Amino acid sequence: MYSDTFDLKALIRPVVDFPKPGVIFRDITPLFQSPRGLRYVADQFIERYVEADFTHIGAMDARGFLIGSIIAHQLNKPLILFRKQGKLPADVLSEGYQTEYGEAFLEVHADSLCDGDSVLIFDDLIATGGTLLAAANLVRRTGAKVFEAAAIIDLPELEGSRRLQAAGVPTFCLTEFSLSEY
């Protein structure tokens, strides 16, 4: 276990004007280049959820897969992949949503979940909440329930966490950034 003074934000690189002017992109690749940082992040989520009552972990394409798979492995939970449109080979459920950059579609295999399942949905970052709201809608369409939405980073000024909570989805993030914070 690491001390409370571990500086997670130091491992999240701000990239100005990416993918478009005026945006500060939060690049988590330095986190994956730090064994200590990656262990810290994984341990924080594992400690939070080790005794939680859910059946599956749903990870968002693509950066959500990276930590989501570690958490699923450590907690011995099935991992459900929520992919961008056209990436899954079998029958899918699809949900459209708005991102901070435009419109997109999220898909999940139609047979991934069923009544009685409870899913922790995971992504690297909550901005507008569009991706995780689409995932929550897909989970509910299968008859399953959303346990919680979790992410490494929250951008509270974009109100994604608020939108998720208003839709009945509790949220948890390890850290947050203001839109102007470097």
From Swiss-Prot:
InterPro entries, per database record: Ade_phspho_trans, Adenine_PRTase, PRibTrfase_dom, PRTase-like
GO MF annotations, alphabetized: adenine phosphoribosyltransferase activity
GO biological process: adenine salvage; AMP salvage; purine ribonucleoside salvage
This protein's record includes keyword Cytoplasm: yes
Catalyzed reactions per annotation: AMP + diphosphate = 5-phospho-alpha-D-ribose 1-diphosphate + adenine
Keywords noted in UniProt: Cytoplasm, Glycosyltransferase, Purine salvage, Transferase
Pfam families referenced in this protein's UniProt entry, alphabetically: Pribosyltran
EC number annotated for this UniProt entry: 2.4.2.7
A single cellular component GO annotation: cytosol
Top-rank taxon: Bacteria
Coiled-coil residues: none
Family the UniProt entry places it in: Belongs to the purine/pyrimidine phosphoribosyltransferase family.
Entry-linked NCBIfam families: apt, PRK02304.1-3, PRK02304.1-5
HAMAP family registered for this protein in UniProt: Aden_phosphoribosyltr
Quaternary structure (record): Homodimer.
Name of the protein: Adenine phosphoribosyltransferase
Organism: Pseudomonas entomophila (strain L48)
Gene: apt
